[in-house]
Amino acid sequence: MRIILITGISGSGKSVALNVLEDAGFYCVDNLPAQFIPDLARYLASEGYTHLGVATDIRSRESLEHLPDTVRELAETHQVEVLFLTASTDALVQRYSETRRRHPLSILTDGVPGSDGEPAFNDRALMEAIEMERELLSPLAESAHRIDTSNVRTNTLRSWIKELIREDSERLTLLFESFGFKHGVPSDADLVFDVRSLPNPYYDLALRPLTGRDGPVIDFLQAQPMVLAMAEDIRAYVEKWLPSFIADNRSYLTVAIGCTGGQHRSVYIAERLANYFRAHGNVLVRHRELAPAT
């Protein structure tokens, strides 16, 4: 049986994800304590079911500590995947403000109704509840496939989940490619970032024969605030728009990073980005002027 467990921060889209599973033919259960999942899986398997989707979250907080053990037990006889949905605190506060729903851990301000007769939320208490939930769930996030929905519309999230659960496809593969502009821009690049404005190790004679993978060059570039800022901006851009590319049913997304010769700056940035995004799934690195894809 294929079992997908959905957990994560309240308000991050778990209900949307569970609905996608149900539409795809999964037998779905919401808010099921973790310790009950193995018995349910055994029963459903005996009845001929092959797909199970379960959402478990802070509403069953006492049982969450059992989830890692539950996953290990299920994995002995089933195909098990864990999706952890999250979002920024600002995004979550905005969503709760729009829906007027209570956070499971939120504290109401003296229980006094607002002008519309509904309980008045204390935004500070809400943010504290969100951060408390993050802390409680952080052990689960570390071992799950994390999905950040902060900047993701509902339709995009649905498409993303559909892609993740497809039986006949693998995840999108991110390819980070360094190159030198003097040799031309890669024709297969989906996104191109120009880092030629960054400080250039080429002008240090001791660093000139090295590459962006060598320690002295890495130390040089990491000491430059401008380099770190540009790397962070590129990372944020790719991470924000990655769901759109996944929803487009792509197999690969090629992100090209170019400097003058393709030896120092672009190599360093490509390696730095690849190291970050490896937590998201399949990642390749290609240094066009140095070596083939790895």
Curated annotation (Swiss-Prot):
Described function: Displays ATPase and GTPase activities.
Lineage top rank: taxon: Bacteria
One GO MF term: ATP binding
UniProt binding sites for ATP: G8, I9, S10, G11, S12, G13, K14, S15
Species per Swiss-Prot/TrEMBL record: Cupriavidus pinatubonensis (strain JMP 134 / LMG 1197)
HAMAP family: RapZ_like (MF_00636)
Classification via InterPro entries: P-loop_NTPase (IPR027417), RapZ-like (IPR005337), RapZ-like_N (IPR053930), RapZ_C (IPR053931)
Binding site for GTP: D57, I58, R59, S60
Name of the protein: Nucleotide-binding protein Reut_A0350
Alphabetically ordered keywords of this record: ATP-binding, GTP-binding, Nucleotide-binding
Keyword field contains GTP-binding: yes
Family note: Belongs to the RapZ-like family.
Keyword ATP-binding on entry: yes
